[in-house]
């Protein structure tokens, strides 16, 4: 049994998907649709840069979605991707929107609009330079929760991504995250401050969640096929209204990726296929369970392999 995975922010790079764009009309049509929806040429930024524009979160989010949907459609229409043995789709953060589009729950037009708005809302939720994120390596989530409890009584310092057994990302107020980093150094633990423009997936994003509420609730969804794993509950959700509510909650909640992967394995998944730029999720799955098969498709060459 297989699960298909779609990456989140941080996997983007200028020129991603260019080989698919050059060769397949279906990809050109997807790019044109996204450009028309957003009323500017996101495709030009994806293919040509500049990198600074691609890294703007309101551009990054729909861009990564467009690449994932493009590659998925090429695999389905030109390489006979067998979906009969696919039990789940799962996406990391914004990747959940890619999963919903590929699962037929959401149109690409609406996903592009929502992700562009989501990016703007998340960036505007906290003044620039007031928030930060740190990746902590080599500690269990229980150890990290004890560590951040020292700082989180009066300040915002929360787990944003539970990525694997040995990688957890913490989000919060910049001064507090810097203090946490110093504390980790004193204890000879490894923390990496992330080059992000806002502290995603924590309660500092409350304003963004409020701003997205009506936009998501007013969007027409249909039940996806196959089922989509929610970042918030770490299991499949089929009720449309609950899916909408969880997409809103996701903005301020931790991404429960480790639990999601373990849940899919418990449900019989033995083969994971990552579709989209980079190999981040493939690396995380390997850290979670070395006994499953993992492959990644980011280029036409990957398909040939």
List where the protein language model places each region.
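FabD-like malonyl-/acyl-CoA
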Residues: 1-144, 271-300
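Alpha/beta catalytic cores of group-transfer enzymes, especially the acyltransferase/condensing modules
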Residues: 10-11, 38, 103-252
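Short amphipathic alpha-helical interaction segments
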Residues: 248-256, 272-273, 277
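A short, well-structured juxtamembrane/interface segment
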Residues: 255-263
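Non-catalytic positions within long, well-ordered alpha-helices that form the structural scaffold/packing
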Residues: 265-268
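Short, charged, surface-exposed secondary-structure boundary motifs
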Residues: 303-305
């Amino acid at each position: 049994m297989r699960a298909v995975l779609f990456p989140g922010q941080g996997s983007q790079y200028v020129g991603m998907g260019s080989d698919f764009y050059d060769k397949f009309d279906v990809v050109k049509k997807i790019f044109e649709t996204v450009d028309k929806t957003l009323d500017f040429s996101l495709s030009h930024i994806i293919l040509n840069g500049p990198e600074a524009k691609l890294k703007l979160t309101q551009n990054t989010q729909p861009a990564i979605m467009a690449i994932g949907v493009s590659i998925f459609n090429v695999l389905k229409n030109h390489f006979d991707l067998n979906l009969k043995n696919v039990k789940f789709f799962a996406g990391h953060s914004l990747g959940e929107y890619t999963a919903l589009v590929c699962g037929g729950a959401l149109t690409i037009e609406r996903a592009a609009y929502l992700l562009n708005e989501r990016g703007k809302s998340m960036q505007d939720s906290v003044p620039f330079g007031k928030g930060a994120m740190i990746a902590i390596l080599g500690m269990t989530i229980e150890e990290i929760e004890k560590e951040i409890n020292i700082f989180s009584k009066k300040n915002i310092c929360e787990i944003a991504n539970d990525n694997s057994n040995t990688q957890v990302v913490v989000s919060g107020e910049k001064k507090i995250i810097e203090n946490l980093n110093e504390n980790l150094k004193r204890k000879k633990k490894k923390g990496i401050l992330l080059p992000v423009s806002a502290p995603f997936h924590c309660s500092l994003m409350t304003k963004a969640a409020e701003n997205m509420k009506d936009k998501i609730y007013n969007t027409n969804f249909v039940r996806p096929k196959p089922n989509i794993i929610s970042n918030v509950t770490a299991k499949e959700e089929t009720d449309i209204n609950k899916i909408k509510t969880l997409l809103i909650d996701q903005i301020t909640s931790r991404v429960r990726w480790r639990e999601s992967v373990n849940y899919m394995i418990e449900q019989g998944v033995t083969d994971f296929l990552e579709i989209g730029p980079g190999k981040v999720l493939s690396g995380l799955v390997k850290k979670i369970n070395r006994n499953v098969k993992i492959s990644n498709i980011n280029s036409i060459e990957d398909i040939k392999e």
